[in-house]
Amino acid sequence: MELKGTKTQKNLETAFAGESQARNKYTYFASKAKKEGYNQIAAIFEETAANEKEHAKIWYKLLNGGSVSDTLTNLKDAANGENYEWTDMYDQFAKEAREEGFNDIATLFEEVGKIEKEHEERYRKLIANIEGGLVFSKDKDMIWQCANCGHIVVGKKAPEKCPVCDHPQGYFQVKAENY
């Protein structure tokens, strides 16, 4: 059966949005409970947030052909979403907030829009890395670090597997020092 255009599609979209928002809200509630010294309550909020994430994933998958797409497709989707947010959505929201006299909120929309632009640029670079075969291979020697055990390798390419902990190449990343 075709889902597109049905009430069920609309209901799935609403369920996905509701579960996604609940997850975030419960995460915020957990943080507040923890700060107030209610560790058990924080843990219950965190557990419920994890449940809501899984509920949202059920609805998301049903809306998207039964699965989550491959990483390259997901990066392209994410980049396009971030582009919309900084070029259209937040720009429009800022204009409307300013027209209504909410200058502080307008400024926040503009500043978040700048962050969304950075997100898009980061995703576009990752897309180029995948398409160019440059995720685990570079043109010059790099310091590669295993994210599991911390093993360091210097070279143009990350090893197929870590010689220390045996984790696959996917655990290697270019070591970044920002300290």
Feature locations, PLM:
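Non-heme di-metal
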Residues: 1-179
